[in-house]
């Protein structure tokens, strides 16, 4: 299983961010062909009780790296990327990883 991870720093206006993210961006992203699952986590703090520099984490799951690459070529993925850059381009870090089994 391959996943793309989007890690967002604290936005200046959390209410405005949440409204756009959940009402606009998530529905656009959910249309990407090959996307198997999308999990969103709001970061609530650090293990020591402090405030985290991060606000939100989104994990988007694909069957394989090949299916992920194909998905990124679609108009739906391009629409998601365009929307992402319009509201969070300065606070998001994107990465791709492959899940591994602990033996």
Predicted regions and their residues:
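Macromolecular interaction modules
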Residues: 1-103
